[in-house]
């Protein structure tokens, strides 16, 4: 039977005090893996889903040069371009993920079905003994899975920043991967709710962002606690959440907040709205948003990130997806945490959203597969404020795209491509992934990440974390 050392695990204040020694334990950055060069490439004779007003193209071509989409059409002239054979492939925008605690991918599947090792207790108990190198290992494993799964943008909602080096190691993993990302700076597991996050370090990080932003691929935001996230509505004192909010505003950082995600958090969105603090904010979960709160979100320009697989798994409830969409609120889809849901399969998340809404409506056609694919691409990009760059295949946008091989055993026939994506496609069907014009997966294999090494080092780090916590 697993036991844990309460002194080691529950000593949150003591753990935070050990930040200096943790920093010493961070791995020395080796030479960063070299990302593939952006080139001049044309994909020919594929089924192209632009997710744009141009619609779909059978036997279509996509021409990419220097990281940008040059043209989309048929029989394109592409002088000097390398050719990728698109026959049997669906070419579509890369998947946009809008909220993921990437660090705790190191704890994959460790949330069990008993109160002593459920998700919150597991992530808090083990997160408190993380060292900076563990942040790198967890986020690097998550990034590899993202690329394997066709995800080209991630929102890394980092809520285990126990000191400056924890944030830098997490960012190091993102930068090495080549993913497009937002890194949202948050608290630590076990952080005193009466204390602000390290606002001085957040300001310092912003001032040195040129070191971390990977030439604009990665941007900075705040993982704001608001009134307390999934805790009771007033868990975080007003002076704390106001100070954090004001810092984000002063630094010009986008805000993202867990709110009204569980029955214990009912009313949080309304409370934040009364304080004038949901304007242009991303609201996560919002399972218990009321009609009045949804109207307030629309008026304030808020967006929402939904994580149906985790919301069901943990028992929060069913998100009111169509209520948000009917109100005109941009909606994105979220992995949330693989500690709880096991993997980062955005195709399964799409299937779950469609099943929940059609089941609730008792109507097979209430939300179409095409609409759900929009949530994972252009709508998700809109919810993150990056739809001017990615989310659809349109000349001038950045070249974030994926290719799905339809000739696999779980596919094999070609009907409605959107229905196929939502109901049948799996991450293993993703043949090629391109981010900003760089090919990061080709012929089913990652091109810039050594998966065997990443998995081996993550497994070793997981065992070390469990040993420090006496968590078996």
Residue positions per predicted region:
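Alpha-helical scaffold segments that flank or form the walls of functional sites
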Residues: 110-179, 201-214, 458-461
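Active-site microenvironment of metallo-dependent hydrolases
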Residues: 2-60, 65-75, 374-472
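His/Asp/Glu-enriched, well-ordered alpha-helical/loop segment
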Residues: 274-280, 322-408, 423-426
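Active-site gating loops and adjacent loop-to-helix segments of metal-dependent hydrolytic enzymes
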Residues: 106-137, 231, 263-280, 300-303, ...
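Metal-coordinating catalytic core of metallo-dependent amide/deamination hydrolases
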Residues: 32-33, 165-288, 292
């Amino acid at each position: 039977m697993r036991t844990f050392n309460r002194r080691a695990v529950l000593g949150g204040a003591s753990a935070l005090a050990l930040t200096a020694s943790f920093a010493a334990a961070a791995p020395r950055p080796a030479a960063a893996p070299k990302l593939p060069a952006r080139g001049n490439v044309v994909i020919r004779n594929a089924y192209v889903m632009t997710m744009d007003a141009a619609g779909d193209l059978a036997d279509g071509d996509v021409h990419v040069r220097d990281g940008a989409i040059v043209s989309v059409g048929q029989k394109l002239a592409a002088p000097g371009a390398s050719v990728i054979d698109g026959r049997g492939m669906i070419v579509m925008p890369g998947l946009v993920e809008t909220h993921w605690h990437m660090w705790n991918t190191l704890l994959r599947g460790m949330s069990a079905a008993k109160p002593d090792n459920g998700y919150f207790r597991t992530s808090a108990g083990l997160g408190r003994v993380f060292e900076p190198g563990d942040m790198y290992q967890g986020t690097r494993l998550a990034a590899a899975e993202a690329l394997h799964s066709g995800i080209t943008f991630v929102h890394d909602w980092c809520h285990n920043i126990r000191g400056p080096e924890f944030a830098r190691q997490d960012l190091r993993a993102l930068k090495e991967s080549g993913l497009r990302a937002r890194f949202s700076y948050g608290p630590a597991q076990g952080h005193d709710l009466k204390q602000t996050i390290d606002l001085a370090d957040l300001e310092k990080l912003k001032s040195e962002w040129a070191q971390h932003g990977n030439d604009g691929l990665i941007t900075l935001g705040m993982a704001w606690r608001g009134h307390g996230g999934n805790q009771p509505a007033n868990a975080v004192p007003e002076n704390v959440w106001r100070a954090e909010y004001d810092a984000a505003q002063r630094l010009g950082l986008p805000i993202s907040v867990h709110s009204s995600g569980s029955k214990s958090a009912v009313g949080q969105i309304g409370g934040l709205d009364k304080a004038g603090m949901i304007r242009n904010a991303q609201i996560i979960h919002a399972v218990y948003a009321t009609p009045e709160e949804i109207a307030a979100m629309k008026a304030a320009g808020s967006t929402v990130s939904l994580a149906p697989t985790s919301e069901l798994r943990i028992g929060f409830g069913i998100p009111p997806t169509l209520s948000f969409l009917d109100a005109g609120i941009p909606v994105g889809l979220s992995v949330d945490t693989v500690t709880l849901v096991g993997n980062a399969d955005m195709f399964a998340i799409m299937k779950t959203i469609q099943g929940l809404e059609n089941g609730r409506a008792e109507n097979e056609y209430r939300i179409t597969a095409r609409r759900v694919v929009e949530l994972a691409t252009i709508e998700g990009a809109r919810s993150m404020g990056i739809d001017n760059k990615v989310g659809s295949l349109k000349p001038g946008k950045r070249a974030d795209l994926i290719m799905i091989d339809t000739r696999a055993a779980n596919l094999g026939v070609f009907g409605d491509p959107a229905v196929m994506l939502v109901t049948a496609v799996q991450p293993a069907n993703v043949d090629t992934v391109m981010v900003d014009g760089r090919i990061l997966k080709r012929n089913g294999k990652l091109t810039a990440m050594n998966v065997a090494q990443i998995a081996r080092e993550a497994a070793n780090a997981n065992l070390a974390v469990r040993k420090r916590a006496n968590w078996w």
